[in-house]
Amino acid sequence: MKDSFLFTSESVTEGHPDKMADQISDAVLDYIIERDQKAKVACETLVANGFCMITGELKTSVYAPMQEIAREVVKKIGYTDALYGFDYRSAAVLNGVGEQSPDINQGVDREDGEIGAGDQGLMFGYACKETETLMPLPIHLAHQLTFALAQKRKDNTLPFLRPDGKSQVSVRYENNKPVSIDTIVISTQHSPEVSQKHLKESVIEEIVYKVLPKEYLHDNIKFFVNPTGKFVIGGPQGDAGLTGRKIIVDTYGGSCPHGGGAFSGKDPSKVDRSAAYAARYVAKNLVASGVCDKATVQLAYAIGVIEPVSVYVNTHNTSKYSSAELEKCVKSVFKLTPKGIIESLDLLRPIYSLTSAYGHFGRELEEFTWEKTNKAEEIQAFFKR
């Protein structure tokens, strides 16, 4: 008897209000870290109807022109006309950024050159063999759809599209392997002139069938395109957006646990971000090495402490090695102190704007060092000793 179930993940476009906030926060981080690698940045953004507020804490010698940074991000996303509900020219930009607490900083910057964790917390990484990039299929497909929504809007293939949008994909699994797409939900902001019939047909034809892998498509997929019937009011005019509210979209679409810490706007001394990247790096290399088919990795830290307080590996019964053996391997092969992570993944670079939409994982860009599988041979060698 086949074990059959559906699993669903979602994604959002770069014009979604929460993603706008993430992108502004990461643009501020990139601006500062490019000029001051010793900076400590925790940047939070709120976007709402007609305004944007940037707040958080900084420790840096760099002056960051918050207004210019925010407006450039909003312009690049595509909010270039007041008719879209938000316009980069006329939106107010408020700056409420303060200084980082010296009580926090004293535990991070150490006299011995090491870096203490910027906070306590637990972070997860995940990898599996469902896609070439070792990501779960549902979130992989959902990101493909939202990325295509933005591209078809920007290249004028579908000129009636506007920046805000979401996707959701339900995948059918049999015996824990994905076999087909069951349901696709796409909600996209649009101009008032386009008919719902034309919009739905165009989105299915130009995006779904031209973007998604043919082996998962079939005639009985259930499509819900703008199921409420109209989506003209969108972006910050429709909903306020905040940094860090799309943490499942940013990671694995719900396929593994999440420690709760968001990424955007945080420099890599914050283990919420850097250790989550490291956990993905570990999980992906474990799967790429062939010692398992699926891996969930948890790392945990205490504020001001150098070494992780715990390392946990779960291979979901896909490995001949025990969790204890795998954890020993991970500690031997990977540098999991904050400084070790920053140096091994080369994280003191202005790369974070690239991560702030369409997922931090599963995108094999040159800048995404945590997606490399250059530790796979070392893992194999560890188990041949």
Curated annotation (Swiss-Prot):
A single Gene Ontology CC term: cytoplasm
Pathway: Amino-acid biosynthesis; S-adenosyl-L-methionine biosynthesis; S-adenosyl-L-methionine from L-methionine: step 1/1
Binding site for ATP: 16, 164-166, 230-231, 239, 245-246, 262, 266
Cellular compartments annotated: Cytoplasm
The family this protein is said to belong to: Belongs to the AdoMet synthase family.
Role noted for this protein: Catalyzes the formation of S-adenosylmethionine (AdoMet) from methionine and ATP. The overall synthetic reaction is composed of two sequential steps, AdoMet formation and the subsequent tripolyphosphate hydrolysis which occurs prior to release of AdoMet from the enzyme.
Subunit comment: Homotetramer; dimer of dimers.
Name of this protein: S-adenosylmethionine synthase
Gene that this polypeptide is encoded by: metK
